[in-house]
């Protein structure tokens, strides 16, 4: 698993590892991201709002077994990242891992994956900007300040601020993401430390009205026995247990973001392997550690839905049990930070993907977006992506259109599974190609691990059909795969035929 030959140049029987400098001859971006930036970007990509707000529902579905689900899904995502990392290690000048789908599966699948991934990023950005404003309003509501009527202005201010960060320089983006990640890490570590103290002193807490819960939570105590009380591997049945996999998967979504930063990272062949190999450690600390701490304080049987079907944040529950009545404001401040980080990363990634698509497009209009600014960032592609994200409040306000938007937004999460599967298939082709570098950042037991990951992602997609709130998304995703995927393949077939005819005519 250790990477060797960091500086490149060693000839292998199956390929030659070129130096980063020689590969960068066509890379117009600036390598402004340091090791510190990338490591914290990787952490930020692992920790999303799902951990802070959504884990309550997943705990209620499976109880302590959710820890097993988080570990299993985390390991599979690690396999995916090792596959991406191996290909990126060979060619760190690529702006996106999607390029490897084009290289090893053909232009048809590359066209499908590239535009699908970019569209999914924009749709996720539209939902994320809505979420940021909602969390911002909730945060101030804890102080009795109503900002509901200023929702559109909040969204505009956040988006303008984050776009400005992305336009200044990649180093500035990296620095902002560093601090976003630091805030998330601090809250999780503070929560785990608080739980440890409560367990050690045998803390007992009274019945309390938790913010965001429409019923009084019962009195209890802190201890490891809460973790195993009334234990059942599938307390709500196997159907609920299977549904928890999709929820956990979406919590890990965008973990691949660190792979998009490679073309702008200093010493990528040294930094990338470290960032990827530490994914397992991050999963154990920030997900497993946090969930164990929560369930040692709050019995898993206490996670019950409100009348409207929503769940309170486990972090808010735990801190309020500890007597911190301002816990709600604290957690929502960090959630605003986490959502802002996600939106910031989506802008970065969407800009790079649109830049890459525009650069290779035969369309002259799109070619204009495939340019970098004087600050070495794809400014035009970022601005176009941001402009589409800014349509979110308008789309949400139009009757009929808003319902379709919700469907497509949720379907965009589902199509990430298609992208992941195509990436793994591209990795299989890479390993069998003359491009393979035996002394690179090689994925061990790749035939087994790659296959396991593909099968697992297919399984996750099938679980989307189990729940009413994800079934339509799964169907919409399949329609997109057949429709746009078929169009992309036919487009490439006709382009290849026309090119062949032109060459024959020239001869």
Label every PLM stretch briefly.
Residues 1-56, 60-62, 78-82, 491-507:
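Membrane-interface "cap" regions at the ends of multi-pass membrane proteins
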Residues 3, 9, 102, 129-154, ...:
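Helix-loop-helix connectors at the membrane interface of multi-pass transporters/channels
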Residues 30, 53-154, 235, 282, ...:
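Extracellular loop-to-transmembrane helix junctions
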């Amino acid at each position: 698993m250790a990477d060797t030959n960091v500086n490149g140049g060693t000839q292998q029987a199956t390929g030659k590892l070129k130096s980063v400098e020689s590969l960068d001859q066509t890379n117009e971006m600036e390598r402004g991201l340091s090791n510190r930036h990338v490591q914290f970007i990787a952490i930020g990509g692992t920790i999303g709002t799902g951990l802070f707000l959504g884990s309550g529902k997943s705990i209620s579905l499976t109880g302590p077994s959710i820890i097993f689900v988080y570990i299993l899904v985390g390991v599979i995502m690690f396999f995916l990242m090792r596959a991406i990392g191996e290909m990126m290690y060979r060619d760190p000048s690529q702006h996106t891992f999607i390029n490897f789908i084009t290289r090893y599966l053909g232009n048809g699948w590359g066209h499908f994956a590239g535009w699908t991934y970019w569209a999914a990023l924009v749709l996720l950005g539209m939902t994320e900007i809505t979420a940021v404003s909602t969390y911002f309003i909730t945060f101030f509501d804890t102080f009795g300040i109503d900002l509901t009527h200023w929702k559109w202005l909040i969204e505009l201010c956040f988006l303008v601020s984050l776009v400005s960060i992305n336009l200044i320089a990649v180093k500035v983006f990296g620095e902002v993401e560093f601090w976003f990640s630091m805030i998330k890490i601090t809250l999780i570590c503070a929560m785990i430390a608080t739980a440890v103290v409560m367990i050690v002193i045998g803390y007992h807490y009274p019945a309390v009205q938790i913010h965001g819960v429409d019923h009084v939570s019962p009195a209890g105590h802190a201890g490891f026995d809460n973790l195993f009380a009334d234990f059942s591997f599938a307390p709500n049945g196997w159907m609920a247990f299977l549904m928890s996999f999709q929820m956990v998967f979406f919590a890990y979504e965008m973990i691949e973001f660190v792979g998009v930063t490679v073309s702008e990272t200093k010493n990528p062949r040294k930094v990338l392997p470290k960032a990827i190999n530490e994914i397992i450690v991050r999963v154990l600390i920030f997900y497993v550690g946090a969930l164990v701490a929560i369930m040692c304080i709050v019995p898993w049987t206490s996670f019950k839905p409100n009348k409207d079907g929503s769940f309170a944040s486990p972090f808010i529950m735990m801190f309020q049990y500890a007597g911190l009545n301002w816990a709600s404001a604290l957690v929502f401040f960090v959630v605003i930070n986490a959502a802002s980080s996600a939106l910031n990363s989506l802008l970065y990634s969407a800009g790079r993907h649109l830049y890459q698509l525009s650069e290779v497009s035969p369309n002259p209009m799109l070619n204009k977006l495939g340019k970098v600014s004087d600050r070495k960032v794809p400014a035009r592609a970022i601005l176009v992506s941001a402009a589409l994200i800014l349509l979110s409040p308008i789309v949400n306000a139009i009757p009929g259109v808003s319902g379709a938007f919700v469907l497509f937004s949720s379907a965009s999460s589902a199509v990430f599974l298609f992208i992941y599967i195509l990436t793994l298939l591209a990795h299989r082709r890479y390993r069998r190609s003359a491009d393979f570098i035996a002394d690179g950042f090689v994925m061990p037991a790749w035939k087994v691990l790659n296959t396991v990951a593909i099968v697992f992602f297919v399984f996750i997609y099938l679980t989307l059909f189990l729940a009413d709130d994800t079934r339509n998304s799964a169907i919409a995703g399949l329609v997109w795969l057949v429709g746009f995927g078929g169009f992309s393949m036919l487009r490439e077939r006709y382009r290849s035929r026309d090119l062949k005819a032109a060459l024959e005519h020239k001869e």
